[in-house]
Amino acid sequence: MAALVTSQLATSGTVLSVTDRFRRPGFQGLRPRNPADAALGMRTVGASAAPKQSRKPHRFDRRCLSMVVRATGSGGMNLVFVGAEMAPWSKTGGLGDVLGGLPAAMAANGHRVMVISPRYDQYKDAWDTSVISEIKVVDRYERVRYFHCYKRGVDRVFVDHPCFLEKVRGKTKEKIYGPDAGTDYEDNQQRFSLLCQAALEVPRILDLNNNPHFSGPYAMLCRAVPRRAGEDVVFVCNDWHTGLLACYLKSNYQSNGIYRTAKVAFCIHNISYQGRFSFDDFAQLNLPDRFKSSFDFIDGYDKPVEGRKINWMKAGILQADKVLTVSPYYAEELISGEARGCELDNIMRLTGITGIVNGMDVSEWDPIKDKFLTVNYDVTTALEGKALNKEALQAEVGLPVDRKVPLVAFIGRLEEQKGPDVMIAAIPEIVKEEDVQIVLLGTGKKKFERLLKSVEEKFPTKVRAVVRFNAPLAHQMMAGADVLAVTSRFEPCGLIQLQGMRYGTPCACASTGGLVDTIVEGKTGFHMGRLSVDCNVVEPADVKKVVTTLKRAVKVVGTPAYHEMVKNCMIQDLSWKGPAKNWEDVLLELGVEGSEPGIVGEEIAPLALENVAAP
């Protein structure tokens, strides 16, 4: 059975803002004095005095006007994504990448899009809206502020509170969920309950169009299109941290006539992290007893407590109007049984689940203009370009420089899911029998970092292990490697194989999740077969699969068949454009009033139109 962790370590022409009926006497700052607030379990503080900004007002030229109108020319949908991570501001894995890339692609298709995430750092490009809410958490009220920036056609809203900002300093990495890999913060329930409630307030109280301290496209947008109430919203929740949002929406808002037509889509990025806590903790969530059954859960684990528990992800699945995940094959795996569904398979068979493969940021990962590469290349120059980058990579890590020697790369978080222990167990047999070099890059659990260094010590002329965060080296490895090894025990979608294909590097991968949907045997890579999901042991059969597949891949390197694979990898469209259209089709099925299909567009990201906070 897969090891289970209690907490993750691992536009339209409408405006989502204060409704017209709030524009009356009694308006307090950017927020009305609303009698319903008492029922919502929160208090309005309104807008505090904002610091003066010396920046000149934004001037719109014809180019700006045409951009804004084109982006909002269709009815579209009002989409509010909510998640614990949002790249590039915060990221530990694929969740951050999705909330960084998918919303921008949806906005490019004419939908009005907002993303809400915690403010873990003092982001230089996010300005203080001066809007404050007091939200009930357990038995007290907590004050939150909202910061905002407008990037790539998307409103990025950051929830500011000490429980986020004071715990994470500098690069976030795994510190979002705990001080170290494998360790959670004790107050994670309170932190993410706060996030869910704060997120529900944003479309109601954050009037970006009329804020005098904002200078950006919204000044033009509010004139170009009619204002509309923020009722017809689709909230897109992501992983267990947002599992409470649908519950709060129903109990605190819809029961009081607010967000009457709003719907919730819940996306599972990794079923292994479910938010399991003591059943007694339900009382701390301030939810009616009628929701208890959605949380009630009994498993065979003794952590965090033995016996009856609450399960945030279970509640998120049951209370959502639509359940999605990040690849079709992963959706099949989740309902296949207890082992891969992590004891929620029966729930997902009941609700149904839709899988949509992720895209990737094709501007950040682009061999044509990648600043980290020794030689840039495209599909027509890939063979020579990759050979030159291989030589540079070999020299960089201290391996013998020889472009004729096949080079295998492994890049990933050093945790059980990614199977670094399986990869390391396979290396001795591979390097003893094949003329090959292997470069390993990753950080994570100390036991795996030690394993990586130990295998380098055993094979100093054939293996290099880099156990520190090194983004430039990751790019160099993508370009210089002949084969990318992905030994994941399970992989909901996977980004690494998409990045590899973007650089013309075929992938030798385990046959699980999104790897099945994205890697085609013999055309863009090599399949190992499915590996065991038991994270506590390294199965000999799994080691054999890795050895056999990598040997097979190494023998193909340099042949005409391999050259064709490089080409096949590079000619694919791996952007968010296709996935965004699939997401649109699914979300339209929710039938939210006023929702319409979007347009076929390109991302809106001219730097001159992006809102950047004053220094």
UniProtKB/Swiss-Prot annotation:
Which catalytic reaction applies to this protein? an NDP-alpha-D-glucose + [(1->4)-alpha-D-glucosyl](n) = [(1->4)-alpha-D-glucosyl](n+1) + a ribonucleoside 5'-diphosphate + H(+)
Primary location: plastid
Residues binding ADP-alpha-D-glucose are 91
Q: In which pathway does it act?
A: Glycan biosynthesis; starch biosynthesis
**Which residues constitute the signal peptide according to the record?**
none
Its Gene Ontology molecular function terms?
A: alpha-1,4-glucan glucosyltransferase (UDP-glucose donor) activity
Top enzyme class: transferase
Q: Which Pfam families does the annotation name?
A: Glyco_transf_5 (PF08323), Glycos_transf_1 (PF00534)
Q: Which SUPFAM superfamilies match?
A: UDP-Glycosyltransferase/glycogen phosphorylase (SSF53756)
Q: Where does it reside? A: Plastid, Chloroplast; Plastid, Amyloplast
| Keyword Glycosyltransferase among record annotations | yes
The superkingdom listed in its UniProt entry is: Eukaryota
List the cysteine pairs that form cystine: none
Q: Which GO terms describe its cellular component?
A: amyloplast; chloroplast
Query: Could you tell me the EC number(s) of this protein?
Result: 2.4.1.242
- What InterPro entries does this protein's entry cite? Glyco_trans_1 (IPR001296), GS/SS (IPR011835), Starch_synth_cat_dom (IPR013534)
Q: Where is the transit peptide?
A: 1-70
Indicate yes or no for the key word Plastid: yes
Gene3D superfamilies the UniProt entry points to: Glycogen Phosphorylase B (3.40.50.2000)
Gene Ontology biological process terms in this record: starch biosynthetic process
Family, per the entry?
Belongs to the glycosyltransferase 1 family. Bacterial/plant glycogen synthase subfamily.
State what protein this is by name.
Granule-bound starch synthase 1, chloroplastic/amyloplastic
Q: What is the lineage of its organism?
A: Eukaryota, Viridiplantae, Streptophyta, Embryophyta, Tracheophyta
